[in-house]
Amino acid sequence: MIGGEEHCVFFSLGVIDELQSRFGKTVGQLLVMLKDPVEGPGYLREILTALLNDEGIRLKNGKRYTKEEVGSLVMQKEIPGLTISLFLAFNDAMPEPEDERNDEESELLDIAQLLIIATSKMGYSEEEIFNMTPKKFFTLFEKYLELNGKKKDTRAAIDMLP
C-alpha cells in the first residue's frame, strides 16, 4: 500500500535495468543501502518511483510519478514495511537455485520409489497408500529414507546452531 492505494509492483527487467544503469550497482546492493539511515530513504524513493512507473506501463493506465510525488506519498512509519516488501518482491523475482530444484526432483523420485516399495515389498495396496493420513504417509516416508541411508541427521544441524 503506497499513498493509500494498493499496487502490484515487481522487479521486471525494465526496472532492474533502469536502477542498475542509474546507480551503477546491482538491485541487491541498492536494497542493502535501504538499511542506511541517511541514504536509505533516497534509495527507497528512487526504487519505488521506478516500480510504480513500471506498473503504469504494464497496466497501460498512463500513470507516471516523479520521485518528489512518490516521496510525498510515503510516511515515515511506512518505511520499514515498504523496505521489507521490496526485499520480498526482489526475492520472488530471483530464480530458484539449481540445487534446490534438484532436491525437489529427487524427493519426488523418492516418493515414487516409496510407493513402489510400499506396494511390492511392504504389502500395502495402492488404495491403502492413497487413503493414508499425511502423518502416516510421512512416517512411512521417513522410515524409507532411514532404511536407504538418505535421511539427514537433523540433530547435528541443530547442534551447530549458535
Give names to the regions the model predicted.
Residues 1-8, 13-50, 54-162:
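Charged interaction scaffolds used for protein-protein
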